[in-house]
Amino acid sequence: MYGRYINITYKCLVYMKNNPKKLDELDNRLLKELVKNSKRSYRTLAKDIGMSTTAIIERVRSLEDSGYITGYGCRVDYQKLGFEFMAIVEISIFGKDLLQIEGKVARIPHVAAVWDTTGNYDAIAIIMCKTRGELSATVKKILSISGVEKTNTNMVLNVVTRLTEFEEV
């Protein structure tokens, strides 16, 4: 009996992930508030939005089950931690193993993010280092990966906004 229940639950979750619910104005407002500060209690969130705590909990769970909310985190000031050198590295890749090569880049220490892109370069990596030497070594490690044709490194002067601060919901 339990096996059948688990199987039905799994199928429902898979269906919900593949067929997400349509968002209404309240869902959008809730997402916007959670992007601003996901650490708030459900009670505070309910008060700010003007709904009951139970309704907020149900909506958040529904957004999680539908795949709109994929996790929670915090924003860290990496400069305060000593990461003074941030760079955007554009990567040109030859061959058919694009995703494998991007995966290798992602596993290199100091690589904070890797995006598969279109345009003049096949991928973009964000690198965060404490010293110029670490940055140089990281770019050289990327270039040493078989399949990486060339890179173009852009030093970040100032971070004006972060991707986690994008609130257009």
Give the positions of each predicted feature:
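A compositional/biophysical signature of low hydrophobicity enriched in polar/charged and small residues
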Residues: 1-169
